[in-house]
Every structure is written in structure tokens, then in C-alpha cells.
């Protein structure tokens, strides 16, 4: 059996401390028992600029799963409700 069968995809989430959508996104991931790398962009204009260049958006959260840009919480929630999130996680 391959060791990669149970490997969770890499998940990165760019957040700020006082963002309720960030909290909601992290809660959704945690409900699914997923671990993620949180990148806090508070007081980090360099990271904010990088985030905007990568995502095309200046809002947080911004979420990537295995280098696939999901978007913010609204898009993550839509992926969860449609079953797309489970498909992305099973790749």
C-alpha cells in the first residue's frame, strides 16, 4: 500500500486576527479534522501585496489546497456544500 493514500493535501490559509470569515474558514477545516498552515498578514504589507498578487484579491481569508486557489470563506463553503472540497482533498 502506498504511504500517500492517507496523506492530507497541503492547505494554506492567509488570515488576519479580527476577521470573522477567517475564523469561519478555520472552523470549517477543523470540523473536517484538517490541518493547515496559517499565514497571518496583520501588519505585514509585504505579505498583503504578495497575497493580492497571488490571488487577485485583497480580502482575507484566502485559501489554497495543494497550490489550487480556492478563494475566501464563501468559496470554501460552496466547495464544501457541493462536494468539491472532498474531491480536492482526495486527490
At which residue positions do the language-model features occur?
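Rhodanese-like catalytic fold shared by cysteine-dependent sulfurtransferases
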Residues: 5-6, 31, 53, 82, ...
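Loop/helix-junction capping segments adjacent to catalytic residues or to phosphate/diphosphate-binding pockets
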Residues: 22, 45, 79
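Thiol/disulfide oxidoreductase modules built on the thioredoxin-like
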Residues: 53-59
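Non-catalytic, surface beta->alpha helical segment in thiol-disulfide oxidoreductase systems
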Residues: 65-91
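Thiol-based oxidoreductase modules, predominantly thioredoxin-like and allied folds used
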Residues: 35-48
